Amino acid sequence: ACNFQILMTSITVAKFGGSALGVEGAMIPKIIDRIRQLQQESKVIAVFSAPLIEYNNKASSMTDVAIHVGRSYAASTPVEIEVLREIYERIASKYVADSRRRQEFLDSLDKFYRQVIISLKQAAENRRFVDVIRSRTLAYSGEVTMSYLMDYVMQGAGIKSSHVLIEKWPIITDDNFEAANFMVQESRQHSDHLIELAEHSDVVSMGGFIGRTVDGLETTYERGGSDRTAADVAILLNDGYDVKIDLEKDSAVLSADPRIVKDDLEFIQYLSYNEAKLAGMFGMKILDPIAIKEIDDNDLDIPIVITDMARPGAVTMIQRKPPDGGNPIKIVTGKKNCSMVRMESAAASHLVASLEFDRQYHDFIKLSPYRVDDTEMTRLLFLDADYVRRHERHIRAYYPKADIVYGRGVVTLIGDEMWRVPKIASTASSTVSEHDINILNLDAQEETSRILIVVEDKGSSVADAVKAIHSTRKKIRGA
């Protein structure tokens, strides 16, 4: 038999977030340089977030500004809306020198801005800034507009680029407008335009965070959703191309949050999907954990690279099964503002099914059960106490006597290989106790690659516990 291998075209799906773009697009020249570097190895699909803007004396995402404007209109206290347009005019005048290209972009901007005005009028009439009114406003004052603009910037820089037309958007979602769910089959049926652009261009520009329903209504993912867009685009292209995802951030992955821990920080070269998903859930801003979940759910193995934009040589590679080695405790992370919910296990299983399948909500952890008399009880640790506050009635509908406790924080040790280290849980817990931090709960299960320590979220207790455990990480390593 003839043994030959078809060489697939390589594509890098590179995501540039708001901080990568900078205030008023100040970092655009660096992004162009970076895209040129990526181009040397492969074609590029560049996924852009909305830029940052100086607003009310602080740097804010255009998404936050648009939400502020929309809510003001809904509350009948309209504010200046030109801000949603003018930033793009300023960026275009600075970075698109060719007058024909600039005019072409400004024509699109006019069209988008009209959509924003119509949506804001509807928000004022309905006294609500929700659903498609919200997602349409965000799309046309944020990611979609920025992706069109970046195409013209790249063309002006001599790059053979194109942009995905919003009318032919490949990311198809359900109609959960503010926290949409990716629909892979429907998206595949709408991906011809994207594939055609990828075939005929070196770089394709596309907006993150935004989806469309089958019948063409704009939707958004939850905040941080541009990571998901990059993952979803990679899923759509994976059959026909050799795809990798490159998330351009202000740092590669470190062993703890550098804002909390200053000493002995270690650069993490490899993470598994599982480790990265856990780290994202438990407070490390690596990437949106749902992005990995979507790749996982589709049973794919697409490499994800986290690149430090300032030092592109510093990368963390995330794979389904990374090579072994290094400290078995990859990351120590902390999360404030958590909530503990206790209820009978039978009721808890129904609540969990409702959250995961009906509401597509996954931001909680089921801890080890315990018994009261003859009844098995379950503890659910919610990683966002505000969600519990908003949905207390829904939770109590499953178990009226549910015990709901707020003011909890969680410190998590993460590593698929931690089970190899003897006494790791007891060392971690005694370290925390030595710092006079009261441990309310410890949950360590070999199969889960995590050790959770629940503490009171009071003052700097979570940060102190992270520092304490991280300082023993080197000692535990070879214990």
Report residues per predicted region:
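Surface-exposed alpha-helical segments enriched in charged/polar residues
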Residues: 33-37, 195, 293, 430, ...
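Glycine-rich beta-alpha junction loops
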Residues: 51-52, 251-253, 308-313, 347
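A conserved regulatory-domain signal marking ACT and ACT-like small-molecule sensing domains
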Residues: 314-479
